[in-house]
Amino acid sequence: MAEADPRLIELLSYYRDAELHGASLLMRLIKLMDDPDAQVKLSLHLHDETRHAWLWTKRINDLGAKPMKISDGYQTRVGLRTVPRTLLDILALTVVVEERSFSRYQEHLTKHDNDEQTLAVLKEVTNDEKWHMAWIRLKLLEIARQQGDESKAEAAIEKYRKIDAEVYAALKAKEIAVFGESVA
């Protein structure tokens, strides 16, 4: 087997790191939410996030490499700009993080020269992200309505989208430096 491209291993390690941090965010939500339906959905969502981290770990191992420790990943960079303190903020951040994961994986599907196994992982995690975005958004809107102002949900999402745009721009610049404009 040919040695894996270290740039690809680094990129897949970033994906793995994002999924692990996503699981951590869901653990916070599990502790904050008493709603039985939310507890069921959060448990499945947490299962998905840790499974995604495992799928990236396995893909890296199958390529003959080891996952890299990522110290400047997406959620670490978001955390340097803000720490959500309310349930609405954590839900809004989760919506934005899931949207970013979905769009990032979609982009990877079209821009990188993917082998069959990497394509399979990308398709599997992308499919799960659709449900993650939908149910968290609905729960966020429901809680905002219960608190008397649904517009709080959209305002929180917009707040985190602005932070996401800054963070993603920096990560994208790094990816362009590594892979070049045509792939990144």
What is the predicted role of each segment?
Residues 1-184:
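Non-heme di-metal
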